[in-house]
Amino acid sequence: MIFETHAHYDDNRFKDDRDETIKRVHEKGVAAIINVGASIGSTMTTMELAKKYDFIYAAVGVHPSDIADLNEETFAWLREQTAWERTVAVGEIGLDYYWDKEPNVQENQRYWFKRQLELAAEASLPVIIHSRDAAQDTMEIMTEAAKKNIRGVIHCYSYSPEMALEYVKLGYYIGVGGVVTFKNAKKLVQTVSELPLDRILLETDCPYMAPEPHRGTRNDSSNIPYVISKIAEIKGTTPDEVERTTRANAFELFTRVNN
């Protein structure tokens, strides 16, 4: 049984065959899926999916590139959604300096990142963290969050092995997806080799980040076995052990998911 901790089935790339795709991946052994909001609109669609399918759970939040969606009114709406029993995390939230270089934009990202972390603390929910080209600021903010007993996962991890181990020391999990199968993913392979298996979560970020041999195509959760096989190869263990351990990790973090 595979636990997919980061999907975007609300994405428009699934609009023509969304239900068929979700049913297919479930039949292929993906027993639990967290669909992750990235904007107010996608969070609404995420919640609709979690109402429709008993194996899909919702993460509610606004991605740093979509913080124009956030004001006190929409933030209050987000707070209300954290009370729903099928909301299992706040996310995806964080910092993305890849596109946004302006200091005032980055400051606004940090402001709403911290506000959404406070939301997670209020609701006793874990967080799903997006961080791109913002390693130091993210680490500083998450170090403070750990002091408030906020738990979570660093999604689609892309920084150094050393920083990953620092996150683990703070109590966070590391999300690993299709990138680990890429030929140029030496840094991530090294990170996985150094991480304890009991701190890794499986994810796709679908429809993005399809693993080899499907790189460049629309991704979905049925591709997770490629990620499992690669992690098993790196760690010198069996795919079954990777599947079992990462599933247990996900249940340990996302406590509102029915086990």
What name fits each language-model region?
Residues 1-259:
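Mid-domain alpha/beta scaffold segments of enzyme catalytic cores
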